[in-house]
Amino acid sequence: PYLSPLMLDKGVVTVTAFPGMQGDTARLECTPASSYYTLTNTTKTRAPSAGRFRVSRDWLENGNDITVSGNVDGKRTGTVNIYSSQDFFMHTFLERLRAKGIRCLPDYSFSEFQKDSVSVRMASYNTSVQAVVNQIMKESDNLNAEAMLCRLGAQFTGGRHISAEDGLSAIRRLIKKLGYVPDRYNLADGCGLSNYNYVSSE
């Protein structure tokens, strides 16, 4: 996923396909629903010649046209990340406000909050580190793992604009503090759990 401070459903769209009559196009449901992305449905119901069920996006062009294809012989579910997660969040947020009858300007912008005479923080939401760690350890969750890496970097540097490398530097410093040699470990990113381990039991 494209990590940003504004994430809606982890920047991912879940597409569920339901079969119809044999040879017909399957019915699709997308969560979260939004006009930020478009949907192309070329699925076929109970038609093995259509190939395996697949959900994809025109990622080479940084587009958000989701294409769902292949054979649907039963309920099928797939996920795809959306380009520019912050814009996905804002676009869908304003769309939901308008659906509730709340008037909004067609344009939007976002930046760091600067408290002044015309700006007031209306709400603040925080997730505990323990809750994030629990999620990371439960299943391979790259988004939360990358977010945790960035959080480590922010705590390590004290800065507001941080990168994955800042988080890796914090981990290397901890390894050294524990009496080990950081260069002996392959620290690549904040990726979630893996079927193979780069780090030894020490």
What does each of the following model-derived ranges do?
Residues A170-R173, D183-E202:
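C-terminal soluble interaction/assembly domains
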Residues P1-D183:
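Conserved serine DD-peptidase/penicillin-binding transpeptidase domain
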